[in-house]
Amino acid sequence: MKTTVEKLSPTRTKLTISVTPEELQPSIKHAYEHIAGQVNIPGFRKGKVPPAIIDQRVGKEAVLEHAVNEGLDGFYRLAVEENEVRPLGRPEADISEWPNEKDFSGDLLLTIEVDVRPEITLPAFDGITLTVEAAQVTPDDVEEELDRLRSRFCTLVTVDRPAKKGDFAQIDLVAEIGGEEVDTAANISYEIGSGELIEGIDEALDTLTAGETTTFEAPLMGGDHEGENAQITVTLNAVKERELPEADDDFAQISSEFDTIGELRESLRGQVERAKSFGQGTAARDQLVEKLLELVEIPVPAQLVEDEVSRHLEQESRLEDDEHRAEVTESSEKTFRTQILLDEIAQRENVKVSQDELTQYLVQGAAQYNMDPNEFVKILGENGQISSMVGEIARNKALAIVLGKAEVVDTNGKQVDLTEFVALPDDGEAVDEDATPEDTDAPAEEAPAAEKPKKKAAAKKKAADK
């Protein structure tokens, strides 16, 4: 099999693949076997119909088309592997020349275009300086954390005043579309300002008093009319506010393992300090990505971005929202650029993903969705998403390696210890040889690199071939 590779653009490649009759023969044999098992011909059992009879009843043209369709994916995969092409998205195949359908002589000529990962030049990582906020813990920070803990032990008390943010409203809801009632809910307890119910509900309830009713328009969040605008009538039955317990020794003993409120405050101070240190690490990672994206030119296939944007908007039922489309386009392009950048770093730094790392990552993912880990892994496997998880781990490790080479200081000029956020280059083998960034050239939402080509309309056979 001969393949020529033509670079159409930094992100688009054309493969011209020439397949000899000998190389196509296994697919032709399989085509005869498959057709023999499908057709009903008197005098022959299924699967036992001779090729000559299939030629008479079905036709060699059908056999050839079946063989080409069956072999196309394999020819493409082999060409990609032999020529070290790194695809992104779904390839498009055109059959330029067919073998002679009378005796299957002559080469099969395939032309396949595919978006590819661009070649990028990585900068030196030494000398990068990042500045993050100082992790200073104030008394107000500690009291804020204490109040959050107290709110978990609060009681709700009915009050006679207008509702405001932070109150719990006891409400009834009625949704109408075109004057017809489509949904109702009674006696719901909702925290005003949480944004967890329906768009516009916080503004509608603000300053409302018990017994009052108001109407507003908003898209429904679920049900048969999800996404449709409806007239929402909300009736406020009661307003309740949190009553926090006293911050004393009794509260410390009830809410923690400590005997005194002083000990509890000291423990909360440590929690706040750890949270701020974690925030420094997160901020440093984000800054590092932004700085690297500024330093490296990374073109992204336009179709790849457009496909992702369309999927996103379709899920949100906002295909006609041009303003939101622009926002999603910018976000998607940045996401792809970041993934390409980190994959390149992972490859240069020889990042490997061990089975233990993958297992830990999957267990954490299952916990986020409150799922059994085995069931979570099963679903990911059925949807071909395991390799995407491997890629995500590799990217995180790649970023941690670069972060370890950067100088991180706070706004006071003090060196920041980010030991928990950095990593050293791998020098061992991954447990799973396939668990490398190359398995995930495409992000989770993309078509995998070895996806079967999408065949265009085939060129008509010449009259001399028939």
Swiss-Prot record:
Q: What is its EC number?
A: 5.2.1.8
Chaperone listed as a keyword: yes
GO annotations of cellular component type: cytoplasm
- Give the record's GO biological process terms: 'de novo' cotranslational protein folding; cell division; chaperone-mediated protein folding; protein transport; protein unfolding
Record's keyword terms, sorted: Cell cycle, Cell division, Chaperone, Cytoplasm, Isomerase, Rotamase
The reactions it catalyses are: [protein]-peptidylproline (omega=180) = [protein]-peptidylproline (omega=0)
Q: What are the residue boundaries of the PPIase FKBP-type domain, all occurrences included?
A: 166-245
Cellular compartments annotated: Cytoplasm
GO molecular function of the protein, one example? peptidyl-prolyl cis-trans isomerase activity
Q: What does this protein do?
A: Involved in protein export. Acts as a chaperone by maintaining the newly synthesized protein in an open conformation. Functions as a peptidyl-prolyl cis-trans isomerase.
Per the record, what about its domains?
A: Consists of 3 domains; the N-terminus binds the ribosome, the middle domain has PPIase activity, while the C-terminus has intrinsic chaperone activity on its own.
This chain belongs to the protein called Trigger factor
